[in-house]
Design a protein with these regions (language model features):
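Small cysteine-rich, disulfide-bonded extracellular modules of the LU/uPAR three-finger superfamily
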Residues: 1-97, 104-149
């Protein structure tokens, strides 16, 4: 088992302080989600997207993953948060253990594919010639996929 948990990448935290990421819906950067098999090994130290151990293209899933639709950041009390619309890869045969969300627009790390978060699905998730859907948690201060308290 290579995935060991969900992480907000340390490089992402630094890049936030450098104004490298823009999550605004209409004028923000392009964020993607790439799916990986259980051989992938990601931690909070992951800095860039990689094709190594990414699942094979199938149906509407292609190399590099799918483009996410940003939800403009907001706050509640002392927590700022943002989210993405759910994404579905149709007619896909996929077995994925986890994912990377990364920014295709920045140049803050070692390239233009700076990672934001590592997602561990907890076990392999599969679809066979069907829909592979990623449902993001509720966009609030306690549950949003990206939160800063």
């Amino acid at each position: 088992m290579a995935f060991t948990g969900n992480f907000m990448c340390t490089s992402f935290k630094v890049e936030l302080m450098q104004a490298q990421h823009n999550f605004t819906n209409s004028t923000g950067h392009t964020f993607k989600i790439a799916l990986y098999d259980n051989n992938a090994s990601f931690t909070a130290a992951t800095t860039d997207y990689t094709a190594t151990n990414e699942v094979s293209a199938s149906g509407s899933y292609s190399a590099g993953g799918g483009t996410l639709t940003n939800v403009t950041p907001t706050s509640s009390s002392t927590t700022a948060f943002t989210d993405f619309d759910d994404i579905t890869f149709t007619s896909a045969t996929i077995t994925a253990r986890g994912a990377l969300i990364y920014n295709t627009t920045t140049g803050g790390g070692s390239g233009t594919t700076d990672t934001v978060v590592v997602l561990d699905f907890g076990s392999d998730k599969t679809s066979t010639s069907g829909d592979f859907q990623i449902v993001f948690p509720t966009a609030d201060a306690s549950n949003a996929i990206i939160r800063i308290a």
